[in-house]
Amino acid sequence: MKRIKQFLMIIALFILPALVFATTGAEIMQRVQDTQKADSSAMDIRLGLIESNGEVRERRIQTLTLTENGLTNTITVFLSPASVKNTRFLTRQRSDGTDDQWIYLPALSRVKRIAASEGSGSFMGSDFSYSDMASTTYDTDEANHTLMREETVNNRNAYVIESIPITASDYGKTVIWVDKETYLPLKVDFYEKDLSTVLKRLITDEIAFTEGRWITKSITMTTLATNHSTRIEIVQAKYNIPMNSGYFTTSFLETGRVL
């Protein structure tokens, strides 16, 4: 009997760690969120609109983010070309988990609020919608996340997570391939509401280690029906830097000045 007990204890030593440290979809997505957290950031970005024939139209933008009291605000400013220069886009997160969004269009010289019904519309001709710009795909309280399997993406080991939104969403679900080493998304499929068709696919083209953290340096979003793509490349990024909250106001949105 004593030997049997010893044997069972040895077996338990192998089994219990696996049970205690079992990985769930929610735990993985929480790691994804934690990996990407920063009190503030400033990014210079090269954005390319890629037609199905390969023609590319380039934009240069700057994006600032500031998180205060757990709420993240983002301002995006278009720097070039001249046709979109000084276009500014503001997203402010609310305590109820929703977002307020405004856009300033220089040609109209006014600020326009983005209604919830406009969330699925294209952001500045890109393959990202207004809702994508305030995406809660990775939020553990905005979707149910299930670990489906593990597989390899571009020679990197990944968790495959199915995320079904709890609240209103433009998508029926997303499937996310999360890098097991860096916890960065390597690939995301965005599905129709009936779950039968992949509408858009996001691919991480390059990851990099900068400012003491892993980041997605280049990503491409493709609308599968049209084969139109949008590539976003981070030229420079700084994190946890002093940031004036005046940038995240409708006053700055309209004037381009911090009052």
Region locations from a protein language model:
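Short amphipathic beta-strand and strand-loop transition segments with alternating hydrophobic
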Residues: 64-65, 146-152, 205-207
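Gly/Pro-enriched, hydrophobic low-complexity segments
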Residues: 79, 90-92, 100-104, 110-114, ...
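A short, amphipathic edge element
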Residues: 26, 57-58, 135-146, 199-201
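Bacterial N-terminal signal peptides that target proteins for export
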Residues: 1-11
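Gram-negative outer-membrane assembly/targeting C-terminal domains
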Residues: 32, 242-259
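Sec/Tat signal peptide C-region and signal peptidase I cleavage site
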Residues: 16-22
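N-terminal mature ectodomain segment of secretory-pathway/periplasmic proteins
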Residues: 23-107, 146
